[in-house]
Protein backbone atom coordinates (compact mmCIF):
# COMPACT_ATOMS: atom_id res chain seq x y z
CA UNK A 1 0.00 0.00 0.00
CA UNK A 2 2.62 2.55 1.05
CA UNK A 3 4.91 1.70 -1.87
CA UNK A 4 2.07 2.25 -4.33
CA UNK A 5 0.99 5.44 -2.60
CA UNK A 6 4.49 6.90 -2.73
CA UNK A 7 4.84 6.10 -6.43
CA UNK A 8 1.39 7.42 -7.32
CA UNK A 9 1.49 10.53 -9.51
CA UNK A 10 -1.39 12.05 -7.53
CA UNK A 11 1.05 12.94 -4.73
CA UNK A 12 -0.79 11.23 -1.87
CA UNK A 13 0.85 11.29 1.52
CA UNK A 14 0.23 10.86 5.22
CA UNK A 15 0.33 14.22 6.96
CA UNK A 16 0.29 15.41 10.57
CA UNK A 17 -1.46 18.74 11.12
CA UNK A 18 -1.24 20.45 14.52
CA UNK A 19 -4.30 22.40 15.68
CA UNK A 20 -3.04 25.94 16.40
CA UNK A 21 -3.67 27.84 19.63
CA UNK A 22 -6.43 30.11 18.31
CA UNK A 23 -8.15 27.63 15.98
CA UNK A 24 -11.91 27.94 15.73
CA UNK A 25 -12.05 24.13 15.85
CA UNK A 26 -10.96 23.84 19.51
CA UNK A 27 -13.77 22.41 21.62
CA UNK A 28 -15.65 21.03 18.63
CA UNK A 29 -15.98 17.33 17.82
CA UNK A 30 -14.84 15.63 14.64
CA UNK A 31 -18.52 15.23 13.83
CA UNK A 32 -19.06 18.99 14.20
CA UNK A 33 -16.19 19.68 11.80
CA UNK A 34 -17.49 17.27 9.14
CA UNK A 35 -14.03 17.21 7.56
CA UNK A 36 -14.77 14.33 5.21
CA UNK A 37 -17.66 16.21 3.59
CA UNK A 38 -16.13 19.69 3.65
CA UNK A 39 -12.53 18.88 2.71
CA UNK A 40 -12.68 15.35 1.32
CA UNK A 41 -10.25 13.84 3.81
CA UNK A 42 -10.62 11.28 6.57
CA UNK A 43 -8.84 11.77 9.90
CA UNK A 44 -7.13 8.41 10.38
CA UNK A 45 -5.57 9.10 13.80
CA UNK A 46 -5.15 11.82 16.40
CA UNK A 47 -2.37 12.56 18.87
CA UNK A 48 -3.57 13.84 22.24
CA UNK A 49 -1.39 16.82 23.23
CA UNK A 50 -1.74 16.07 26.94
CA UNK A 51 -1.16 12.32 27.17
CA UNK A 52 0.95 12.13 23.98
CA UNK A 53 -0.99 8.97 23.09
CA UNK A 54 -2.14 8.20 19.57
CA UNK A 55 -5.75 7.25 18.94
CA UNK A 56 -5.68 5.19 15.75
CA UNK A 57 -9.46 4.88 15.67
CA UNK A 58 -10.81 8.39 16.28
CA UNK A 59 -14.52 8.68 16.94
CA UNK A 60 -16.90 11.33 15.70
CA UNK A 61 -17.33 12.36 19.36
CA UNK A 62 -13.61 13.08 19.92
CA UNK A 63 -13.13 16.73 20.87
CA UNK A 64 -10.46 18.88 19.23
CA UNK A 65 -7.87 20.25 21.66
CA UNK A 66 -5.25 22.96 21.29
CA UNK A 67 -2.03 21.43 19.90
CA UNK A 68 -3.81 18.18 19.02
CA UNK A 69 -2.29 16.53 15.97
CA UNK A 70 -4.65 15.34 13.26
CA UNK A 71 -3.26 12.61 11.00
CA UNK A 72 -4.76 12.26 7.55
CA UNK A 73 -4.07 10.62 4.21
CA UNK A 74 -4.63 12.49 0.98
CA UNK A 75 -3.28 14.54 -1.86
CA UNK A 76 -1.31 17.72 -1.20
CA UNK A 77 -4.11 20.02 -2.37
CA UNK A 78 -6.66 18.60 0.08
CA UNK A 79 -4.11 18.54 2.88
CA UNK A 80 -3.43 22.24 2.30
CA UNK A 81 -7.20 22.87 2.31
CA UNK A 82 -7.50 21.05 5.66
CA UNK A 83 -4.64 23.08 7.12
CA UNK A 84 -6.41 26.31 6.14
CA UNK A 85 -9.75 24.92 7.37
CA UNK A 86 -8.50 24.37 10.93
CA UNK A 87 -6.59 27.66 11.18
What name fits each language-model region?
Residues 1-24:
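Flexible, Lys/Arg-rich cytosolic regulatory linkers and terminal tails that connect or flank
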Residues 16, 21-86:
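Cytosolic Rossmann-like ligand/nucleotide-binding regulatory domains
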